Amino acid sequence: MCAADGCPVAIEVFEGNTADPMTLSSQIDKLKQRFKLQRVVMVGDRGLLTSARIEQTLRPAGLGWITALRAPAIKQLAAAGGPLQPSLFDDRDMAEITSPDYPGERLVVCKNPLLAEERARKRAELLAGTENDLARIAARVQRARSPLRGAAAIGQAVGAVLGRRHMAKHFQISITDDTFSFAQNPLSIAAEAALDGIYVVRTNLPVAQSDAAATVRAYKSLSGVEHAFRSLKTVDLELRPVFHWTAPRVRAHVLLCMLAYYLQWHMRRSLAPMLFDERDPAAREAQRASPVAKAEPSPAAQRKAARKRTDPVDGEPLPVHSFHTLLGDLATLTRNVVRLGRDRLTAILATPTRTQHRALELLGLTPTA
């Protein structure tokens, strides 16, 4: 669980066969009882904050929520006569609508052109791959020597191909004991293409508390939580594999990893001037024309990435680091203990380099022997 700025505040371990939505109740109790929060807004993805969880857990608890609709629900909104029509995006990429299916709630519909292009490209790639595989099956059915025969055998081969890329909805299939034919379904493809790049953010918060832009920004801030989860599991802390076999030890292991990430999160913010990390999130957000648009690095971050140097500090600019390379640099600092005579010990610290001195300064640390 993370705060709005991405700072981790709590972690809990569940049995491996527990579905994500079923973990919600305990987290609400934690927020209210342990943290004594009176007003809580839960921001979660469409897999966690499902309609069932909203109706059974969040609404009775009087909580606010921000989540997104699944593809079938978006398709219903876009049906003939529905509130979600292409004309909404003639001169904007975000609009607010309502629907009787979501009483007392606000729906913010967004269209991201870059996401639309990517989905169209991926669909074309999947269609082409599926068509090639189906053509090979058709050739097996039509060949003179040892042809593929039997509706069941042909259907099994076709099902494997369609299931691999999940493209069954976009093909019309005809199978008999000794024939097989297929064709793309243009109506299905066109209907899906019409919704490319469109997503719908759902909330019960009043406009005075969170307008459309703030609601979209809050939902997109989930990327920070996802980054924290990835950092714990893989690239940074490598939580797995877990070499523990009892529940208390597994929980202790996960808690220590979360505390390590908490420390890393604060260190990265303090060391941002020396890292490739974004130093000025407010400037990055201010240059966006819309919260739907892709976030670009701030001018300061772009200069830092281009020059591979920090802003001038005490003379020449310093090299820009990743978090890991900077830690590696700091790890070269040594503390040497010298024995003088039999009983006298003297500790001597290595003299920090300019890079190390600046890092320690940003962290508010003063090395002592």
Please provide the spans of the model-predicted regions:
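Anion-binding and metal-coordination hotspots
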Residues: 1-369
